[in-house]
């Protein structure tokens, strides 16, 4: 009798696990239903630095290139890449790829603007649905504006959009992977109250080599209100 009960528990548990994987990898609905309704602009809440987030456009190429070139040494230690050395996308190809990702509901990239100038970028990628509903967050801010609180505010705004905004993907969890020596980025995670989930070995190819990353997560259930409420307004 005890053997039968144990077998039944194992069977039910296995079905649950296998069902979860089927939910993840099987499209049970029309993929077009997952298309992200990208907002034209997300504004910082009143009382915070007056940054805004907006999707990248093809006519941003010159300004985006200028900011990236001016910050090339500042950003290089943290740049991820393709270990197989694939051909880099042109700017317009990159924008078209973003539009495809938005339509598929698997990614969204926003420019960070301050006083009508591009000062950085924040993105939500590798979005999974089904039993997981999770996504990876990435960001960078121009060295000129480091220390102004733009990065944590931009990540908080993105998280609020991803968790609860009607136009967002309604995720359960977001994750940030951070190089152990990237103390500025770890302060962003700390300011937002993300949970340190430990080290992931050789997790991402960065600046020419596979690197360990520390994983930080935030759940929609961790935040009863707005993620930006976790920050102190800076005006």
Feature names for model-found ranges:
Residues 56, 67, 83-90, 104:
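Generic, well-ordered alpha-helical segments
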Residues 76-96:
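Conserved GNAT-fold acetyl-CoA-binding loop/helix
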Residues 83-85, 96-111:
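A short helix-loop-beta-strand connector motif used in the catalytic cores of GNAT acetyltransferases and
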Residues 2-63, 67-74, 109-235:
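Acyl-donor (CoA/ACP) binding surface of acyl/acetyltransferases
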